[in-house]
Amino acid sequence: MFRTMLGGKIHRATVTEADLNYVGSITVDQDLLDAAGIYPNEKVAIVNNNNGERFETYTIAGKRGSGVICLNGAAARLVQKGDIVIIMSYVQLSEPEIAAHEPKVVLVDGNNKIRDIISYEPPHTVL
């Protein structure tokens, strides 16, 4: 049996752009993708902390060190520049793999620069 588990997360990133006329997806600074173990074109879930919207799309690698978080296409209707989002990828793991699995949780500052990388979130943690 396989279970769907958190693979990587970019926690509380600030939306820098929203481009309605782009074909689709989310553009993310390549440094953030690497740190979270998320690949270009990988399916991700997005949560908008400002309005509660949850949606799925895929990633496009943005310029390294740019801090870019840009929602493209229809997803641009669900965010505004300055909104705080959580970007999550998931992995399929077998029961034996679960015990050794540690997700990569990337904590960022207000400029989308890496503040810390953790693998465990205790209950009721405020980050």
UniProtKB/Swiss-Prot annotation:
Cell location: Cytoplasm
Primary location recorded for the protein, binned into one broad class: cytoplasm
This protein's pathway: Cofactor biosynthesis; (R)-pantothenate biosynthesis; beta-alanine from L-aspartate: step 1/1
Entry GO MF terms: aspartate 1-decarboxylase activity
UniProt keyword Protease present: no
Protein keywords: Autocatalytic cleavage, Cytoplasm, Decarboxylase, Lyase, Pantothenate biosynthesis, Pyruvate, Schiff base, Zymogen
Annotated GO biological process: alanine biosynthetic process; pantothenate biosynthetic process
Residues bearing PTM Pyruvic acid (Ser): 25
Spans through the membrane: none
Family statement: Belongs to the PanD family.
Name of the protein this chain belongs to: Aspartate 1-decarboxylase
